[in-house]
């Protein structure tokens, strides 16, 4: 397997064009203002036209991600949302896979974490607990303020504010849940199989494609496993240090359209 470091011809194992491109959104594909550039959309359309399948993999809930990716409709792309809790079709919205937690499990995690500020994403809405300051950067969706997690709808993701100055907690499966993080000061709790690797693996199984033909882009701890599993894992230049160390290759930062630059190189090198 060979990669590229900011420049050069990007290839995956066997010097072939990737069959699947997987990209994170915030801090990776998206600009810092939360938008998708015209350049990025054009690059995604170019690789899709060459037969490469596109997967967007994000911590955002599906309803937020779809709003941001409206310009990328028509790609036949897959959407992995809520850190892998849901796999769906970007265009039609059909759900292919879902891994959720019971409200009782979430309440137990909140109690164990010391009643820090929290919010939860369910399939169609967000609930904000005591002390949570806003609804994050997840678009114009409404969020109901609650005192506790109610019974009823399963929970896709629990988000908890933690001290960003303290050493980060150990991430991974912890009993009946999985801990991950998409940014400093934020802990995300999901079902054990609600992670980007498991979710993308389900997409690949349906396509009959192996990981060796995947290129993945990311910037945060919740992308590390994905970059390690892919035939080529590419970190954007603004990625956290551990993600850059885990990656096979490095591209420009999100605000310099690093993903688009890499994809443009892929199109030019594999004609």
Tell what function each PLM region has.
Residues 113-229, 238:
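Conserved acidic, metal-coordinating active-site core of Asp-based
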Residues 51-55, 75-77, 156-157, 212-214, ...:
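Short active-site oxyanion
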Residues 3-15, 66-71:
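Short amphipathic alpha-helices and their capping/turn segments at secondary-structure boundaries
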Residues 72-75, 82-83, 114, 173-176, ...:
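Short, structured coil segments at secondary-structure junctions
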Residues 76-82, 99, 138-139, 179-180, ...:
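Short hydrophobic/aromatic-enriched beta-strand-loop microsegments
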Residues 17-34, 56, 227:
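Asp-based phosphoryl-transfer active-site loop
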Residues 11-12, 16-20, 37, 190, ...:
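Mg2+-dependent phosphoryl-transfer enzymes with acidic/Ser/Thr/Gly-rich catalytic loops
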Residues 35-135:
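Active-site phosphate-binding/coordination module
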């Amino acid at each position: 397997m060979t990669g590229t470091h900011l420049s050069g011809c990007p290839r995956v194992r066997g010097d072939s064009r990737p069959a699947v491109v997987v990209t994170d959104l915030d801090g990776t594909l998206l600009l810092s203002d939360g938008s998708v550039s015209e350049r990025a959309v054009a690059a995604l359309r170019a690789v899709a036209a060459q037969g490469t399948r596109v997967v967007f993999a994000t911590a955002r809930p599906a309803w937020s991600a779809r709003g941001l990716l409206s310009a990328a409709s028509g790609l036949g792309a897959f959407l992995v949302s809520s850190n892998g809790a849901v796999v769906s079709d970007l265009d039609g919205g059909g759900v292919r896979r879902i891994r959720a937690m019971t409200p009782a499990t979430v309440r137990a995690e909140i109690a164990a974490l010391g009643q820090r500020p929290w919010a939860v994403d369910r399939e169609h809405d967000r609930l904000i607990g005591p002390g949570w300051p806003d609804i994050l950067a997840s678009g114009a969706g409404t969020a109901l303020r609650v005192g506790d997690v109610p019974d009823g709808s399963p929970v896709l993701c629990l988000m908890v504010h933690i001290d960003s100055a303290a050493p980060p907690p150990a991430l991974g499966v912890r009993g009946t849940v999985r801990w991950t993080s998409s940014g400093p000061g934020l802990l995300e709790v999901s079902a054990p199989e609600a992670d980007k690797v498991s979710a993308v693996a389900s997409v690949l199984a349906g396509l009959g494609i192996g990981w060796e033909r995947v290129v993945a882009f990311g910037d945060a701890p919740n992308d590390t496993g994905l970059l390690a599993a892919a035939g080529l894992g590419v970190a954007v230049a603004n990625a956290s240090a551990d993600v850059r160390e885990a990656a096979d290759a490095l591209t420009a930062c999100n605000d310099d359209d690093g993903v688009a630059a890499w994809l443009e190189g892929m199109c030019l090198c594999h004609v």
